[in-house]
């Protein structure tokens, strides 16, 4: 609620959300008019809230996406998938989805962020590689015979 309250106090508009029902702990929220001075823009959130931020053009959208210390996951939505891939490659995040949600996890895929969102990669071989160091230990059980 902190992210939503801060954004609304600074001029953003609540497009949907806020309705409490008996079976929902926290309803989803869509907030429009989010600017760079709002917590919803600046801080990493795992709650059911999305901020709508308008960009002037593609370059501005990439700049906005990268203007944060966090970088767990991003998504690019477009009709032109080649353009979406080009944009995705410029966004500083551990994961970037083209035409898919920011939450997509598969056990065999490396999952993790960059910047303040990063502690390595979880999942499959990447998880093992991130949290282990390769060592080589040899042992001879019999004395060696070396020609000296």
Predicted regions span which residues?
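Short, small-residue-biased leader/transition segments that mark boundaries at the very start
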Residues: 1-2
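Short secondary-structure junctions
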Residues: 11-18
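Conserved C-terminal structural/oligomerization subdomain of aldehyde/semialdehyde dehydrogenase
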Residues: 22-148
